[in-house]
Amino acid sequence: MSVLSKLMRAGEGKILRKLHRIADQVNSIEEDFADLSDAELRALTDEYKQRYADGESLDDLLPEAFATVREAAKRVLGQRHYDVQIMGGAALHMGYVAEMKTGEGKTLVGTLPAYLNALSGEGVHIVTVNDYLAERDSELMGRVHKFLGLNVGCILANQTPAQRREMYACDITYGTNNEFGFDYLRDNMAWSKDELVQRGHNFAIVDEVDSILVDEARTPLIISGPADQATKWYGDFAKLVTRLKKGEAGNTLKGIEETGDYEVDEKKRTVAIHESGVAKVEDWLGIDNLYESVNTPLVGYLNNAIKAKELFKKDKDYVVLDGEVMIVDEHTGRILAGRRYNEGMHQAIEAKEGVDIKDENQTLATITLQNFFRLYKRHDHDGKEQPGLSGMTGTAMTEAAEFHQIYKLGVVPIPTNRPMVRKDQSDLIYRTEVAKFEAVVDDIEEKHRKGQPILVGTTSVEKSEYLSQQLSKRGVQHEVLNAKQHDREATIVAQAGRKGSVTVATNMAGRGTDIKLGGNPEDLAEAELRQRGLDPEEHIEEWAAALPAALERAEQAVKAEFEEVKELGGLYVLGTERHESRRIDNQLRGRSGRQGDPGESRFYLSLGDDLMRLFKAQMVERVMSMANVPDDVPIENKMVTRAIASAQSQVETQNFETRKNVLKYDEVLNRQREVIYGERRRVLEGEDLQEQIQHFTNDTIDAYVQAETAEGFPEDWDLDRLWGAFKQLYPVKVTVEELEEAAGDRAGLTADYIAESIKDDVREQYEAREKQLGSEIMRELERRVVLSVLDRKWREHLYEMDYLQEGIGLRAMAQKDPLVEYQREGFDMFQAMMDGIKEESVGYLFNLEVQVEQQVEEVPVEDAAPSLDKGAQDAVPAQAGARPEIRAKGLDAPQRRDLHFSAPTVDGEGGVVEGEFTDGEPAQAQSDGLTRAERRKQAKGGRRRKK
């Protein structure tokens, strides 16, 4: 354990003692709540809300609130929170990451802090890793909250903005990290206050926090729209590179000549083209110099084509389905619906596979998950800020330092409810991969013969299919669970603990379903009640009454098989390869031995595994030559075991550095994002922009005058050029001659005098413009102009910042720190953008030809869509009265181009949603009591599809 980790764990005992005290407090009052009727229990929610409003803090209410939820869960779900679950709930409320082993009931733990924090009325977000879990948990755990009188919402990929707004208005909202993040970004692209769906970021509980905040933190959430790009080159280069040969790098010092046309570094995932390759490409394309500035884009196409050929392997990194290239997640082995590689990489792979090549996209809005989750802040009664983020996972201690450094989150390991008795066997290492899989199949066959349930973990779809073929040859019945079959997933996992079952799965990280020995009684009981026509949503009371008996019957059925499986040694987890991260290995192991059940785990490795090949190549070669053992005999070697551990920590450190680096660079953009989004929000909130436009005008005029009069005497100033600039800005009425006359002569002019005179003139022209258009239209024009210019400038700025970041690494060669340079230049670009926004806003305001359309009646949205609950109305911004709708050439219309969403996905399901937004009305715009804007929004929402 590193020194840093030890320091991290220094205060652990103190926190655990505090959590024990809280659990004891809750236990001491448990009986008082058991005697209450359902109605009395429900009435407590309003009482707590009132006490909070009267000045009590949430910490004061904690013991009673937890006892209330414990009693409600007992009545509605037939599950009572264990003491360790109460401790976990308290840790979450205090803003920690609670490390709870698999099968300790993390989902149930979330109900405690969610209920407590919902009492403040600010909203609680519970973040899961995929849509299936969000829906399942909001339905299952939502029963407890609904029983206590709170309303629960769930954000899913295909909802319309009106539905989303209603879900966010609920006390507790479930959803995936991507949906929460995209809604934040879309809110900051909204054209009016009525389009906003979120109501702030108060408190978030993140399930599988390590997957979301660590594994996926390197990939930002991006909303992009189409950019102009020539697609013909991708196809041409895909054909070209098939004629180039891979070779090795040369070394002039050792006199080794380079071979082939290009070299590939698998470890760094880079390629480099050799002289011979360049010559061939120039020859084939008929150009003189590939590296001339005019040919720069071609170098990018060439590099991407080589990478697509060498580094991106079909059925490992991506699959081709229905003529589309789909990325496979390296962590979970699932298909990432709709996610595309950027920088033209995806197009290069499409060209390689010969499928349709889609357009490249330009970033319109972006945020990393790290910065999104740092938005969550709670405020106590005195307005003091407290962290609003917490999370739970089975494996967090290995990343404790990272949680602390980046999110300021402490990690608390919560003890298990029953002691752990799983046997973790030592690794078996084989010389070749073929021999390893032979041994794996032998082991599976032997264990299967006696009936022990087996779960096999593989690292890629390819390997799980290879193993499946081997098992079929031996006649072993088994289930395969990988990226290609999402739908049956939960059912397969729930039954993976039955006698004689064999389940082969790509990374099981974050699958969220418990493997219970002998089968899952909850699933059986639920199926029985649904067959009888009951629904937990509609028949809350009847469901609660019928559940205990159904559960008992299901448990009896499962119990006999459970005892049998227990005798056989419980679930056997077999890993066929070590993952890059120790944490994912531990997650796989953790599927077995839950709640004190027996279990066993073992990893089979070979010296040809990716991890060993990439990080410990020389050492592997040494062992191979030393160990003169036949292929089918495992190598027992301390050195190899140590090498594996060191390779894993090497990869982890490397990934942590990458994430820290991403964050440092995004930090620069984050501060800029806060300024721009804050500005946008003020415009949307309907703040009167008159004063702001005044500031914009004054600043622009000062800048113009300053630029022209900074040097020389008044006689030297080029006032004609200055007036030319003013004329482009607004219709100038005052002339140079008038000013000279007033000042006596040219020499009497001062910069201040010119600036003041022009400002007075602008004010007059502004008032004249307002009189001509009418003040209401003028206000709407200001709003639209500022939003339109702000958005366009921010889009251009994001593009520039991307471009800057790509090349900034080269500054290191000039002995400069790339990050410092990026901060400095990024700040200069931001200043230039802000000046541009001011200047263009003023210019547009005076020079646009405005047409006023008919007045649009703004119908309060709650009338348009049936509301879940009266409480939902608070969050719906209904704008009274009518607002003029205006059109002007050069002003963005409040519709979106085709938008594309790209985000990390922990579990494939969250994927990426691709938007196709229509330009005008939906085809049937029947009069349905909605405004045009809302009908358009509904059309947008309805057309979103998952790919």
From Swiss-Prot:
Single Gene Ontology BP annotation: protein targeting
Location, primary (coarse class): membrane
Biased composition (Basic residues): 934-947
SUPFAM superfamilies from the UniProt entry: Helical scaffold and wing domains of SecA, P-loop containing nucleoside triphosphate hydrolases, Pre-protein crosslinking domain of SecA
Region ranges (Disordered): 864-947
Protein localization: Cell membrane; Cytoplasm
Catalytic activity: ATP + H2O + cellular proteinSide 1 = ADP + phosphate + cellular proteinSide 2
Keyword Translocase: yes
GO CC term (a single one): cytosol
Basic and acidic residues bias locations: 884-900
UniProt topology in membrane: Peripheral membrane protein
GO molecular function terms attached to this record: ATP binding; protein-exporting ATPase activity
Keyword Transmembrane helix carried by entry: no
InterPro entries: Helicase_ATP-bd, Helicase_C-like, P-loop_NTPase, SecA, SecA_CS, SecA_DEAD, SecA_motor_DEAD, SecA_preprotein_X-link_dom
Keyword terms: ATP-binding, Cell membrane, Cytoplasm, Membrane, Nucleotide-binding, Protein transport, Translocase, Translocation, Transport
Residues where ATP binds: Q85, G103, E104, G105, K106, T107, D514
Pfam families, A to Z: P-loop_SecA (PF21090), SecA_DEAD (PF07517), SecA_PP_bind (PF01043), SecA_SW (PF07516)
EC number: 7.4.2.8
Cross-referenced HAMAP family: SecA
Quaternary structure (record): Monomer and homodimer. Part of the essential Sec protein translocation apparatus which comprises SecA, SecYEG and auxiliary proteins SecDF. Other proteins may also be involved.
Note: Restores azide sensitivity to E.coli azide-insensitive mutants, but is not able to complement temperature-sensitive mutants.
Its biological purpose: Part of the Sec protein translocase complex. Interacts with the SecYEG preprotein conducting channel. Has a central role in coupling the hydrolysis of ATP to the transfer of proteins into and across the cell membrane, serving as an ATP-driven molecular motor driving the stepwise translocation of polypeptide chains across the membrane.
Family affiliation: Belongs to the SecA family.
NCBIfam families, alphabetized: PRK12904.1 (NF009538), secA (TIGR00963)
Identification of the protein by name: Protein translocase subunit SecA
Native source species: Streptomyces lividans
Lineage summary: Bacteria, Bacillati, Actinomycetota, Actinomycetes, Kitasatosporales
